[in-house]
Structures are given as structure tokens and as C-alpha cells.
């Protein structure tokens, strides 16, 4: 992890204080900050870039309009498998298990996406859509409007927006 493995002694001694789960909830909520990078789409490309940026210490939020990470794959035709062999589809930092089939079934891959996001501690909002994005040249920041599952909207100001919404999807 190139020296990025965190060492947290505080939670071991303060049994009534915040623990890892509390800190993850706060990190994912983005209540008091904006991400440096907003990644639109949380499948292969989106999760991979979020993992790479996170390992570099870049505060990154990935969003996906699906209810669960991987649902874009779960909804596809029943017998779908990847058309490329497992060995060329590994994710950064966590290769697929050696016991996996050569051609990964869609549901297995979708479940991996969820597992990967959790294991890599990626900040992901599901059931969230990008409604609008405008770039402010003077501030060198984007203004993005995100629509959450409950219908609420959230305005954020990331420095960068990365579109990973798939080869068949066009931004609106």
C-alpha cells in the first residue's frame, strides 16, 4: 500500500469514542466537505479509478444511479459472462481469487464490485444521479447537482469530474 496503511491507536483506548464504522459513515456522508474528485459510475472503471485515487490520498466520491453497486451487471441477460479471461480483468490491489472461473459470470462480477468497494473503503453513493454539472473557470471547480434516492438534491464543488458511465451510456 506504499506506506498508506493507517495506524489508529485512539480507537483502541477510547472504548466509548468513535470507531472505524463511525469514521466510515462520516467519510461517506460528505456532510462537511466536498470531494476533490467526483466519479460518475461505480462499475469496473469507476471503482478502479476511485481505488487508485484513494490510495494516492485523493478524496474521491463515486456515484451510481443503480440501487446497489453492480446492479447494472445483475440486470443483464441471464447467461452473461465476461468475454475476456479473468487474468486480464483483475482490479488494482485485489486480484480475483485463483479459484474463479476463466470467464466470470455477471452476478459473480456484480458481487465482486460490492465487495471491492467495501474492502477498499471506497466512498460510493448508490441511487444517485448527476443532474447537472458546470465548470467555473475562475474557481477551477465544478458545481454539480446530485439527486439522491429520497428525491433530495445535493450541490457539491469537486475539482474534477470523471465520467465512467459505460460504453453504451451517453451523459445527458
Regions found by a protein language model. Name each.
Residues 40-43, 65, 126, 158:
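A secondary-structure boundary/capping signal
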Residues 1-36, 111, 169-172:
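Extreme N-terminal leader/targeting segments of oxidoreductases
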Residues 54-78:
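Glycine-rich FAD pyrophosphate-binding loop
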Residues 74-111:
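Glycine-rich active-site loop/strand segments that organize a redox cofactor
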Residues 49, 72, 135, 172:
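Short glycine-/acidic-enriched loop or helix-start segments at secondary-structure transitions
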Residues 32-62:
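N-terminal Rossmann-like FAD-binding beta1-loop-alpha1 element of flavoenzymes
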Residues 45, 68, 168:
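Conserved Rossmann-like nucleotide-cofactor binding loop
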Residues 1-3, 103-169:
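Feature captures the FAD/FMN-dependent oxidoreductase FAD-binding
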Amino acid at each position: 500500500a506504499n506506506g498508506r496503511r493507517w495506524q489508529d491507536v485512539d480507537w483502541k483506548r477510547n472504548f466509548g469514542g468513535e470507531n472505524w464504522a463511525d469514521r466510515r459513515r462520516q467519510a461517506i456522508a460528505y456532510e462537511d466537505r466536498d470531494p476533490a474528485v467526483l466519479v460518475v459510475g461505480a462499475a469496473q472503471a469507476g471503482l478502479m479509478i476511485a481505488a487508485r485515487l484513494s490510495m494516492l490520498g485523493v478524496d474521491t466520491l463515486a456515484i451510481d444511479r443503480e440501487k446497489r453497486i453492480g446492479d447494472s451487471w445483475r440486470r443483464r441477460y441471464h447467461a452473461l459472462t465476461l468475454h475476456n479471461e479473468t487474468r486480464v480483468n483483475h482490479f488494482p490491489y485485489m486480484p480475483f481469487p485463483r479459484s474463479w472461473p476463466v470467464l466470470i459470470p455477471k452476478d459473480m462480477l456484480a458481487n465482486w464490485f460490492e465487495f471491492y468497494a467495501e474492502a477498499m473503503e471506497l466512498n460510493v453513493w448508490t441511487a444517485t444521479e448527476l443532474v447537472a454539472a458546470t465548470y467555473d473557470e475562475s474557481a477551477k471547480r465544478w458545481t454539480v447537482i446530485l439527486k439522491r434516492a429520497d428525491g433530495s438534491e445535493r450541490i457539491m464543488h469537486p475539482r474534477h469530474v470523471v465520467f465512467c458511465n459505460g460504453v453504451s451510456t451517453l451523459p445527458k
